[in-house]
Design a protein with these regions (language model features):
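Single-pass alpha-helical transmembrane signal-anchor segments
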Residues: 6-30
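Short histidine-centered loop motifs in beta-beta connectors
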Residues: 51, 57-61, 65-66, 115-118, ...
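Surface-exposed strand-loop junctions at beta-sheet edges and helix termini
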Residues: 61-62, 67-68, 99, 108, ...
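Short beta-strand-turn/beta-hairpin segments enriched in glycine/proline and small hydrophobics
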Residues: 33-51, 91-108, 133, 141, ...
Length: 232
């Protein structure tokens, strides 16, 4: 019996110490850091939209192409659509130069084409998205923070970043900005419920985090990330 006590007591003490240590570590981490895996690599993206409706007569870009602001990416044939319609032909001829200028599809920013939705011969409508260009020279992390924790997050706080594509690698960064509205604030569907029942959902606020990529490791928009923000 005495021998059993000599074995059990040290084991119990060891387990207690482990529990205390784990609890202390958890308390320290929660008091000093905010961590989430609701984050991903992102970049400033702009939709490329036509200023007039027409048929795509030329389209010379593909996903992955680098483009410069103002570069002509394609052209629309707009006259074939209006010549047969009830349009004053004299007015059409007088405004030909203006229409031709609008028929040129130009890159709105410097960047990389990350999506293209059209091919030569298709008809596109005014304001429709023909392609998306991203400024991949300034990649950042977009994290979604719960409204219950958002007031812990402030610009300039240091951040440790892990990208799933690079296991074992930790990137440094800092909080650049906190969005002034929740993700759903500008949803086309109202969050108001008129049926008499309502389920409250925790809202998420987008936070932009810079990432220091000294090794210039390749990163793709949408790659999963885990971030740890120093809140003290």
């Amino acid at each position: 019996m005495e021998k059993a006590k000599k074995i059990i007591i040290p084991v119990v003490i060891a387990l207690l110490l482990i529990g205390i240590g784990a609890g202390g570590y958890f308390f320290y981490e929660s008091a000093n850091y905010y961590k989430t895996d609701n984050a991903s690599v992102s970049a400033h993206m702009v939709n490329i939209v036509p200023m007039v409706s027409g048929t795509v007569s030329s389209w010379g870009i593909e996903e992955g192409d680098k483009v410069n602001q103002g570069q002509i990416l394609g052209n629309l044939d707009v006259f074939s659509m209006v010549s047969s319609s009830k349009v004053d032909q004299t007015a059409l001829e007088n405004s030909a130069n203006s229409i031709l200028a609008k028929a040129e599809i130009k890159a709105p920013i410097n960047g990389e084409i990350v999506q293209t939705n059209v091919i030569k011969g298709v008809t596109v409508a005014l304001g429709s998205t023909m392609a998306v260009v991203a400024d991949t020279s300034d990649m950042f992390i977009k994290a979604n923070i719960e409204e219950t924790n958002i007031f812990k997050i402030k610009p300039e706080q240091k951040v440790s970043i892990k990208i799933d594509a690079y296991p074992g690698k930790t990137f440094a960064g800092y909080v650049e900005s906190v969005a002034p509205a929740t993700q759903n604030a500008f949803s086309q569907f109202s969050s108001l419920n008129t049926s008499g029942t309502y389920s409250k959902v925790t809202q998420m606020i987008p936070v932009r985090i810079s990432i220091i990529n000294d090794e210039s490791l390749p990163m793709l928009i949408g790659m999963n990330a885990t971030i740890k923000i120093s809140i003290k």
